[in-house]
């Protein structure tokens, strides 16, 4: 993945740029910086969800994204949340659910799961897509310490076993360190990477 962003503005106000970032499969980076600096906007540009920017974006790798709030199919079971959007087989999906501690919950709907379970389901779905690069937008925020530690461990294990790269948005440098991600700080106005 290569991004050469010249500028991103909201109306007349420039918020990002210039920013150059290259991340390949197996490489891990963390985007750090204060609230409102543009970390999520930058991640949305990388994901292709925000196309209103000046510059170029080349993404030959398959991407998967885990948002801060779980984005699940509420009318589908946990198993279907993995198989439908990703094309994973039922066996692959069941194995991933077991890997994230959701064995026996294959038939549960998202509303029947705790927030921590929903986040683990989101993580399993991202890996069911077999990404070359995983994009994560503050996925560990507002979790209790034990759940956060479990999610960090699961993420590290899945990254190691899949060989996927990582672009993590976080406020916490310790999360970046736990995942072996090279910290990059977004700062300034307009924000640039340092």
Model-derived regions: residue spans:
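A short, proline-enriched helix->beta-strand linker immediately N-terminal to the Walker B motif
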Residues: 128-132
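Hydrophobic anchor residue at the start of the ABC signature
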Residues: 123
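Helix-to-loop junction immediately C-terminal to a conserved catalytic motif
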Residues: 47
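Conserved H-loop
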Residues: 163-169
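Conserved ABC ATPase signature
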Residues: 109-113, 117
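Catalytic Walker B motif of ABC-type/P-loop ATPase nucleotide-binding domains
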Residues: 134-138
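Helix N-cap at the start of a conserved alpha-helix in ABC-type nucleotide-binding domains
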Residues: 145-147
